[in-house]
């Protein structure tokens, strides 16, 4: 839960006065908004690895679950070095760098294996990570956040026609909004914090997210029809302030980089197990029903997005590299 505004402002004021160095130790401030358990565990594993491998010369200070604000606020705090490391959705990152918009392309990845090959390919990812360097931060890694699927309050999506006119919450992403329009729905961009009440009050007919939204955000209480169309696999992105990186020694940078890579593998291993637990909990606690569908009509409906990519040279070039890296 977020702190009240005046408490958060006081915390930020205090943080801004604290030195990066304290009694011979380097303090890295790692902040994140509400997350799935595998991502939380991976972030804490990252911190443990850094502290262990530096012999305690670097300590990691955590600000979890939105203590310092939502994801956009955390990016802005990372830009100015108040936060050293944060984790945000690449969907949000689209508003900071167009390159991140490629991960919002619908039905881009057919399998998890394809997805992992692309995300672990430095020729694909390094230009994306470095695209925000002039803004004061860069990407340094990624975490799996699963596939985004539709879930509805009154009836399941079994055919593309079932989406027609439905008010669906999406992230503030141009590509996500265009995707929903092509599928016949009425996309509504709003913060995650507003979704539960909006579903409950009928402002929304449904939303789209991974299975953790059903339990962590308790959306399964008010929208229990979950359909696997897997329209996107939008990764979470680890960001570091360039101010922070400049203060670390080359050896410290190497240790942090190795810890990030280890935490990525840690999170991958945990993801599938936690998803299955979440599915079972959603059925038990909220009577959620899960549906599989034929994705082909959905894929055909969004083809205009791909047809328009050639008019966006940077994005089209990245898309081509992704297609090559899949194999």
From Swiss-Prot:
- List the InterPro entries hit by this protein, alphabetically: DctP_fam, TRAP_DctP, TRAP_DctP_sf
Q: Which GO terms describe its biological process?
A: transmembrane transport
The residues forming the signal peptide are 1-24
Q: Name one GO molecular function term.
A: carbohydrate binding
**One Gene Ontology CC term in the entry:** outer membrane-bounded periplasmic space
> Among its keywords, does the record have Signal?
yes
Keyword set, alphabetical order: Signal
Please report any disulfide bonds recorded for this protein chain, giving both cysteine positions: none
Q: Which Pfam families match?
A: DctP
Under the heading PANTHER family, the entry gives: DICARBOXYLATE-BINDING PERIPLASMIC PROTEIN, PTHR33376
Under NCBIfam families, the record lists:
dctP, TRAP_S1
Q: What is this protein called?
A: Uncharacterized protein YiiZ
Instruction: Please name the taxonomic classification of the source.
Output: Bacteria, Pseudomonadati, Pseudomonadota, Gammaproteobacteria, Enterobacterales
- Could you tell me the gene encoding this protein? yiiZ
